[in-house]
Amino acid sequence: MVDSRQEHIKLGTYPPEQVYQVLQTSPQGLSSQEVKERQATYGPNQLKESKKEPIWLTFFRHFTSLMALLLWGGGFIAMLSHSLELGIAIWLVNIINGLFSFIQEYRASQATAALNKLLPSYARVLRDGKEDKILAQDLVPGDLVFIEEGDRISADGRLVAVTDLQVNQSALTGESNPIYKSDQADLTPDKTELEYDNMVFAGTTVSSGSGHFIVSAIGMKTEFGQIADLTQNLAQEKSPLQKELDHLTKQISVIAVSVGLFFMVAATLFVHQPLSQAFIFALGMIVAFIPEGLLPTVTLSLAMAVQRMAKDHALVKKLSSVETLGATSVICSDKTGTLTQNAMTVNHLWTLSDSYEVTGLGYASEGQIEQEGRPISLEDNELLNRLVRFSHLASNAQVVAPSADNPNFTILGDPTEACLNVLAEKAGINLNDNHTWAPRLKEIPFDSDRKRMTTVHKLELGLDGSQHISITKGAPKEVMELCSDYYDNQGMIKSLTATERQAILAANDQFARDGLRVLAVAYRPLDSEHIGEDKWDMQTLEDNMVFLGLVAMSDSPRQGVREAIEKCHRASIRIIMVTGDYGLTALSIAKKIGIVQGDDARVVSGLELAGMDDNQLKEALKGEIVFARVAPEQKYRVVNALQELGEVVAVTGDGVNDAPALKKADIGVAMGVSGTDVAKESADMILTDDHFASIVHAVEEGRAVYRNIQKFLTYIFNSNTPEAVPSAFFLFSLGRIPLPLTVMQILAIDLGTDMMPALGLGVEPPEEGVMDRPPRRLSDRLLNRQLLIKAFVWYGLIEAALAMGAFFLNYWVNQGNLNHLASSGPLYREATTMTLGAIIFTQIGMAMNSRKGRGSIFQVKPFANRIISLGIVLEIVLFIILTYVPFFHTLFNTAPIGLDDWLYLLACPFVIMALEEIRYRLFDKK
């Protein structure tokens, strides 16, 4: 077996005879003894899976994260506080979250299994001079393997014989056009392994023709195996949101435990409470600071965003990926199928007399031939008629229309030829009638050395005085050299002079600069002395041909892509094209759709990238850049370099070759239509329409999710201050002021009235202008200084003042003074009920304040968010139940309140909304 990449590349430079020597085999194949020895040396032709964490440990890990432990503790505290149902509910939320996370991680680990599915089960080999069908896993280096149309190739190898062989290497390169294969030595310098036409690779498929090759690499040594090795050995990084939640729970834990210990010690030393009561009191304070609804709210917010994204053709496999999209600063996008249609379309027709545009996109036959916007009919233009008809006659591809089983066009054959069929249909030609008019008698297939193909047709009605013609299509320069004449727009055949030849080459060069693929079409009327199978040799059929014109085609940009890229630029998101296509084509498309905006953009080929060290690559990544003809590990390397520069990277891909980069990226995006199972398993998100614009919609949702989590945190932490301040009054008055808010009342707020509005804030739609701001920095915190000041100081102190005002006002109204405040009985319970009610009703106003984001309260549509509206109704209903149903009076230390008290409570939300609007107009609006 060839061990090094460099030795493998050298195989492409050897003639077939030398390949047998290098790989120590013969045209009769290996002997049985040699096979046994090599199986012992090299092992089976299989992809190996690296050792993984036991499934039970993975399962257990999802229930012991810091936030999970906080929730287990919160549930336990609730049970200690005589609230068994609430404690069980918290634990159920924890179990559901843990199970969901485990399932997501388990599914994401199946990429290697999907890779194995792409390898065939059997192979046809020559051993001991006899053909045999064996298990593909039993192949060894040196085996002589037969392949034909439809076969999936089972190992890497060097071709030693071919017959019209074409191989689809899209699984490795991402480019869907079949590659014409050769068995001849290729001495072209500076080629990568995948660029050698005389090499074949495991996991690719034979599109047409046949051949046989000598196995040079098996299992993990193949290109396929190296991709598998890269893919499965990548450590699964935590998403930015997961890292943030870990950081947040640590902060909350420190705050909660510190406050709890402080109040327990203070209650014991200064108020002389028994240690058991002080402990329960401290537990209540810890509960006040633990956001029990954090995980379910985050999960719901992400899940609702996932639902909205699904409507925009983006299926998210991993919930935390939604927010990661919101932090994305760079998108590394493939070209074919994502930015472009993945459908070759004829855009221009050129003759020595005129040039024409062709409208329509993709393989649909809607469109027409135009000249300066005016439709052109073939009936009035014989030159154009011949160019279009003959292009189709020399095509072997078929376009299968969408059906109930397959909603997309299916191409049988070469996509370059398929678009010639579509061109003919746009021109009004019936394809079957065209074949009937000029049935094919012979074909000289396309050859990568000749760069053209030729067909022979019989015309019953005749053409130019002959009933037989040959048609040649291929590379313009090669076809032009076969021509002695050209056909003009007057129906005349004229001599092709140096002037016309220069014009043809100039037109071809211009099309190439525009990123178009160009075919030239020519024909030759065959006179009677050249009729007959024995006379149709290449020299005869391709001699003294008549030049018709050029057909220029491209994989056109998708509709809406340019607008999506402009949106990314406004949002300060860079787009970097990383493609397997050629540099000029890639740069042309990049300019056309706005990825590249300057004239000094750099195109880096895979070969050039291989010569760069990491520092040079990072420096190159700072400017406008397009990567072309890159290998799988190079795409991975580009992603890694960007991450080391501090970028949050999203990567799109559809092939097996994209799997390592998809897994390495912060967010991997696979194509749902054209993508392989391997790409889909490796990705975090799947685009059901393969459209780049869908990623941009997803980024918008991701940004909204982060803002929604901040809104939710602001909302729930607002009530922490008014929950803690009453306890401070109790402690600092040395018990002379009775406890204005009990532990059970704190639990009623945190696990009851606050939950539904908080969940509603988690599903707010994206704010206006969310894509006009740069992505958040990774150093930005969910619980940042601004949020802490806003929640605990500004909003918190307002709520605390309103809550304590309600408490003291109740005593003042009912007792006439604030001396000797009762610490038990109906008056005390009524006062604590007012404290509880003031916090609940102020939180209603806070729900509206949180919804407004960076704008004015008057911009908020009060009933647009149904969950918040329902939550407000439910918290009012819950407060009424706690206040007026006698069963709850003892448990929650509540009592009925009067109409005057209700007027105070109903004013609370409007007070906090008014104060926030004043603050906004004085500070934020400016």
Language-model regions, residue ranges each:
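Alpha-helical transmembrane segments of multi-pass integral membrane proteins
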Residues: 791-806, 841
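Generic alpha-helical transmembrane segments
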Residues: 753, 830-847
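A C-terminal functional module that forms or caps the active site or interfaces directly
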Residues: 850
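Membrane-water interface at loop-to-transmembrane-helix junctions
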Residues: 779-797, 825-834
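Membrane-helix interface motif
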Residues: 804-818, 884-889
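Helix-coil boundary and interhelical linker segments in multi-pass alpha-helical membrane proteins
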Residues: 731-742, 809-830
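Conserved cytosolic headpiece of P-type ATPases
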Residues: 1-775, 779-783, 797, 836, ...
